[in-house]
Amino acid sequence: MTRRTHKGVTLIEMMVALIIMSIGLLGLAGLQAATTKYRITTMSRAAGTGLVFDLSERIRINADAAGPSFMQSGSEVASLYTIASDWTAQQKDSFSVSKNCNTAACTSSERATFDLLTWRQKVRDSMPQGGAMLSGNKRDGITVTLMWFDKEFTDGSSDATLVKAPTCNDQQTGMAQQTCCPAEAKAAEGVRCSRFSFVP
């Protein structure tokens, strides 16, 4: 009588393979969840870059309405490209345009009003509960603060409490300066800010 050796996969080897595969699939599911979590922030920041470029082009086209230039002396002319209302007030704004400067001739002042209304509508459409603040002029530079609501902006605890973005101050530099919200914005919990500056 000869003894035959068993060939093939045993049940135990099969179970080990299934366990290893299950752990791998759980890892992939976790990676997918993390990717989805950061998607809103990434998309909003990417949209913000395009929005700032759009605004800078609008201001360059209508530079006379953006305040004094380097060459001007004498009386200060305030920039018409400013937005000072806080985030909560902006959520209630309706952006009705009285004169469409794309189809009718407009003065520099009317063009600035039209530009801001249409640009603010783009901000709201591109970002969840989007808002913006603008300050400065073409001589000193324009500072743009984009604000949006991010339900994932939490403290990391198990109850996922929304946190408030840091308030801007003079001591901040680098990323802290670029992601803080101005005090005037009165940003609610869960609102993120992204700040940009440019000279038209």
Q: What kind of region is each of these model predictions?
A:
Residues T2-F53:
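Aliphatic-rich helix starts adjacent to a transmembrane/signal segment
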Residues F53-P200:
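Flexible, low-complexity segments enriched in proline/glycine/serine and punctuated by aromatic residues
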